[in-house]
Amino acid sequence: MKIAYFDTEIDPTSHKVLDIGCILEGGRTFHSHSIPGFVDILKGVTFICGHNILLHDLKFIHQSVTAAGIQLSNAIDTLYWSPLLFPNEPYHALLKDDKLQTEDNNNPLNDAMKARDLFHDEVASFLRLKEDFKRIFWLLLHDQKEFAAFFSCIGYNCAKTETEAIIRQNFHPYICQNADLQRIIGAYPIELAYSLALIACNNRNSITPPWVSKNFHAVESILFQLRGKPCLTGCAYCDRSLDAEQGLKDFFNFDAYRTYEGQPLQKKAVEAALRNKSILAVFPTGGGKSITFQVPALMSGQNVKGL
């Protein structure tokens, strides 16, 4: 199954194709502005692959791709897979937000080679995932245009099963048991996949890449629904990770908040913040106001990357 990795340089005003770089899996290269030459090297290719090609390159050269006999549904975009497979900070060395790290900004052949290297790393990373995590990604993403070609190319599929059940089974200690997962799965499968990847990496310094937040706005809301909103009945996750006293212990190693005239004002203020509620609490000078801001902020940073 042949794959062509490519990148283009496009005039931002005229949208004219200024340069094209392409490398086949076997090593044959193409570097020219010639559209007929690009079509020629693509003949016999099954999949095309590049970085940010769905939002950028294919807008300008999609006719060349189809002229070579390649279905546009067979376009693999490494951009969308990167936050799923490299969520840990520091991130993949070839990435800088939605761009490839490159020494030469005007050499599409060099960027095509970088896209090839990144794709190979993504495939290797996917294959190293636990089987249940592979299944979760497939169940959420196999019919999404940004992800379907990747699964087809590597030949991965699995039996359809209850998506909510397998997510709850694997993320039981890390998300609220009363979150409306079924609604999120139906409405925001891509955003949920990005959220789960970030949760699973368990690295407080890892964040959602800016381009993901820009293009998939619901990620922030989903993280909040899964990990930042205490449920009314309580559950294993909320009782541990959204508990005001546990947060005080975790971050400051204090066992209890101060009380004032018998009132636990600090604790009430922190609990109100954790529940996104308003409260008016009047503290004496030096009465520990700062900790009522710090504890919920630090807990938000840890739970939903909200700091």
Label each region the model flagged.
Residues 2-11:
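Two-metal-ion RNase H-like nuclease active-site motif
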Residues 3, 46-49, 305:
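Structural motif
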Residues 18-24:
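Short beta-strand scaffold segments in enzyme catalytic cores
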Residues 24-92, 99-126:
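Conserved DEDDh/DEDDy metal-dependent 3′-5′ exonuclease domain
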Residues 94-178, 182, 186:
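Acidic, Mg2+-coordinating catalytic module of metal-dependent nucleases/exonucleases
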Residues 186-243:
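Interdomain "pre-motor" coupling segment immediately N-terminal to P-loop NTPase/helicase cores
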Residues 232-284:
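Conserved pre-motif I regulatory segment
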Residues 282-287, 291-307:
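Conserved SF1/SF2 helicase motif Ia
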